[in-house]
Amino acid sequence: MSPPTVPPMGVDGVSAYLMKKRHTHRKQRRKPTFLTRRNIVGCRIQHGWKEGNEPVEQWKGTVLEQVSVKPTLYIIKYDGKDSVYGLELHRDKRVLALEILPERVPTPRIDSRLADSLIGKAVEHVFEGEHGTKDEWKGMVLARAPVMDTWFYITYEKDPVLYMYTLLDDYKDGDLRIIPDSNYYFPTAEQEPGEVVDSLVGKQVEHAKDDGSKRTGIFIHQVVAKPSVYFIKFDDDIHIYVYGLVKTP
């Protein structure tokens, strides 16, 4: 297995706060278009992708999820791409000629007990680099992916975006090793007895970059196995970022 392809944009850190919502009042409210569209979760799709002056690429993949806090946003695993993408398939002008395919997503049998034992674990994942060298990436197995039963969500220290791999064979072959310290990667957030921590899912986030510019996004998912860890979708990026947020005194 080759190392994951690192997306072109990186993030140094996230500072999150709730942003004031702007409410617009209209005389007539039109029913959102996504309510009348076919449910495409679990479907195989293909479409063109046009980025700036670059030639059109043809992408093919599987729709994993429709984000509940932002229903126009879909989570997709594209064939041949290691990272998971978040796209507004019906709104993004870069998506050309979206087509739903008649193909079915295969559902092979899986050792559920072994699969579940990997969830929430910090791991060392070994990839084969150039000239047969071994590259070791440390990260965390976040969850089993929806729809594609043999795949897992995973993220890495070197690149905090959401990736998807079939990890069981790597684990059996010794190329995926569990790090005994479960808090190695994402420390567990301290919580007072009886304290109830509100989820940030659906809240907006602002990130200040090193150059002083800012980017905005939204928390779209809280990791069940590690509640201090969230998936973030930034407005200016198609990748899904993974960050652990720990309360500071």
UniProtKB/Swiss-Prot annotation:
Start and end residues of each stretch annotated as Tudor-like domain 1: 41-90
Chain spans, region Tudor-like domain 2: 119-168
Entry annotated with the keyword Cytoplasm: yes
Keyword annotations of the record: Cytoplasm, Nucleus
Subcellular location: Cytoplasm; Nucleus
Gene Ontology CC terms, in alphabetical order: chromatin; cytoplasm; cytosol; nucleoplasm; nucleus
InterPro entries tied to this protein: SPIN/Ssty (IPR003671), SPIN/Ssty_sf (IPR042567)
Region annotation (Histone H3K4me3 and H3R8me2a binding) ranges: 128, 237-239
Any one GO molecular-function label of the UniProt entry: histone H3K4me3 reader activity
Domain of life: Eukaryota
Residues annotated as site: Histone H3K4me3 and H3R8me2a binding: D159, D170
Chief place of localization: cytoplasm
Gene Ontology terms describing biological process: gamete generation; negative regulation of cell population proliferation; positive regulation of canonical Wnt signaling pathway; regulation of DNA-templated transcription
Annotated coiled-coil segments of the chain: none
Span list, region Tudor-like domain 3: 201-246
Disease annotated for this entry: Lui-Jee-Baron syndrome: An X-linked disorder characterized by prenatal onset, generalized overgrowth, extreme tall stature, enlarged liver and spleen, macrocephaly, dysmorphic features, and normal development. Hemizygous males are more severely affected than heterozygous females.
Family as reported in the entry's similarity comment: Belongs to the SPIN/STSY family.
Quaternary state and interactors: Interacts with C11orf84/SPINDOC. Associates with chromatin.
Biological role stated in the UniProt entry: Binds to acetylated and methylated histones, including H3K4me3 and H4K20me3, probably acting as a histone reader that recognizes chromatin marks and mediates downstream cellular effects. Promotes canonical WNT signaling, and is involved in the down-regulation of cell proliferation.
Record-given protein name: Spindlin-4
Organism encoding this protein: Homo sapiens
